[in-house]
Regions:
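Conserved helicase C-terminal RecA-like lobe
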Residues: 122-123, 127-204
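Conserved helicase motor core of P-loop NTPases
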Residues: 1-133, 139-141
């Protein structure tokens, strides 16, 4: 009865707002229904690369593939690996929800030279622009007590400290997950990449 009383209305969104290139919008519409020919196929073909740069994020369908590629790339770097563990508190089910759904892993492996992605937006009072944004890519320069030093593509060096997420921001007794807001960025799942703004990406 309550559901019926709510009198929900259904709306169909017809206009694409995120892209304004007509040919690209048409291609996306075709891909959604499995049409890959003509101009749409040519757009895809124009982006084929046999040897993408290692700094370009790769998108995979499963976490196992992502972890394997990220750890392989990390192992190729010289230097000592640092393992950073999340600090968690609160009800178990809420902790599990945060661990499962956050972009930031509970166990973060880093070393100087590692390609990483920021997983939150960080604003500072005296800055007109964010210090860093969710999806932005950078390279680890150093790991200090209490901070990971990251250099962005623009050349800005940032000391990244722990960030705390809560299951319910209004409830201090709800589960908390504290970790450096970073993840290895050589690869990620297509699911986790949704909503991010990536300069480039490689799909096999």
């Amino acid at each position: 009865p309550a559901w019926a009383a709510a009198r929900f209305r259904t709306f169909m969104l017809e206009k694409v707002r995120r892209q304004d290139e007509a040919a690209f919008v048409r291609a996306l519409r075709d891909f959604r229904v499995g049409r890959v020919w003509g101009d749409s196929a040519r757009i895809l073909q124009s982006r084929v690369r046999s040897n993408p740069p290692s700094t370009m994020p790769r998108l995979f369908t499963h976490n196992v593939q992502v972890d394997k590629w990220n750890m392989f790339q990390l192992s190729e770097l010289p230097g000592e690996e640092t393992v950073l563990h999340a600090e968690q508190s609160g009800p178990e089910l809420q902790r599990e929800f945060l661990t499962r759904n956050l972009l930031t892993p509970a166990t973060l492996h880093v070393k100087p030279g590692a390609l990483v992605m920021f997983t939150v937006n960080k604003n500072e009072p005296n800055r007109s622009e964010p210090l860093f944004v969710n999806g932005q890519i950078g390279t680890v320069q150093d790991v200090e007590p209490g901070a990971v030093v990251v250099k962005t593509k623009a050349g800005t060096v940032i000391r990244v400290e722990r960030f705390t997420w809560r299951y319910d921001a209004q409830d201090e007794d709800s589960a908390a997950f504290s970790q450096f807001p970073l993840r290895l960025a050589w690869a990620m799942t297509i699911h986790k990449a949704q909503g991010l703004t990536l300069d480039s990406a490689f799909l096999d």
